[in-house]
Amino acid sequence: MTRDLEYNITAQDNGVTISDYLKKQGFSHAVTVQLKKIPESILLNGKWEYMGTSLNGGDCLFIHFEETESSENIVATNLPLSICYEDEDILVVNKPADMPIHPSMNNYDNTLANAVCHYYQTQGIPYTFRCVNRLDRDTTGLTILAKHLISSAILNSEVSVRGISREYLAIVKGFTEDEGTVNAPIGRKEGSTIERQIDVLHGETAITHYKRLAYQDGLSLISLKLETGRTHQIRVHMKSIGHPLIGDFLYNPDFTKINRQALHSYRLRFTHPVTKKPLVFTAPLPEDMQALFPEMIL
């Protein structure tokens, strides 16, 4: 997979080196190392230059990047793939339930990575799988995939400064407050490699905002926005205030209404890693959650 990028340098970057300018654009150290291995990957006003060369207003910086290898140890598998958006830099997918993001010992060929690698293999395009916002196996909805190392680096830097806004929909037990915020650190539960818990002493900062959208038959449909992205954050936080997600095999194993955790990645807002245009994507409630609130159209 190849990508050519062009940057028109303004006066405010007079004297800035190419290396520092690329860092400012979100290029990681791994990207710059890779660029050094590619012939004529960095052209300034049509001529090859070193990373330490200084820029001037009016300069044209051209970046050529290419990846010729695909992800190792990921079997290309023909699985359903719901693509919401695709361009040269990113892929936005609406992930179904019962699909892990990455392969593991017990999930060798049934993951999103397998499906996406098959999608590009059939087109003859080398592709390395890079997921920006990971979802649990049974969480449905939107996830962003980077199509090359540059977009991956830029998007991950946005994640680190909370530049990607994520909104979820969940169905929880009981009648919640109209809205609220859970600010409670999360850490691993002792004796478990999977389960998390509120851990005031050793946990990492975690903040979740929620708002009730509807109530029916002892269940609340809520929207949630995250300030942080801890493992199982929504599931642990909602349980901690007495409103666990229904169908959650770890934190509330009650499958009378639904056979998986009722959690859906509903909306993503972020800046495109290359064009810098604002992007917004939404994915409607999946059928199993919609069936519990049939009158709610989101």
Locations of the language-model features?
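RNA pseudouridine synthases
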Residues: 1-181, 288-295
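Pseudouridine synthases involved in rRNA/tRNA modification
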Residues: 1-31, 35-36, 81, 201, ...
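Short, surface-exposed secondary-structure edge patches
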Residues: 50-54, 223, 260
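A short beta-turn/loop motif at secondary-structure boundaries
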Residues: 133-137, 202, 214-216
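Short, conserved beta-turn/loop elements at beta-strand boundaries and strand-helix junctions
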Residues: 177-178, 191, 215-218, 231, ...
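Short aromatic-glycine motifs in intrinsically disordered, low-complexity regions
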Residues: 193-201
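Short proline/glycine- and basic residue-enriched helix-capping loop/turn segments at helix->loop/beta transitions
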Residues: 205-207
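Long C-terminal interaction/binding lobes of large macromolecular proteins
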Residues: 210
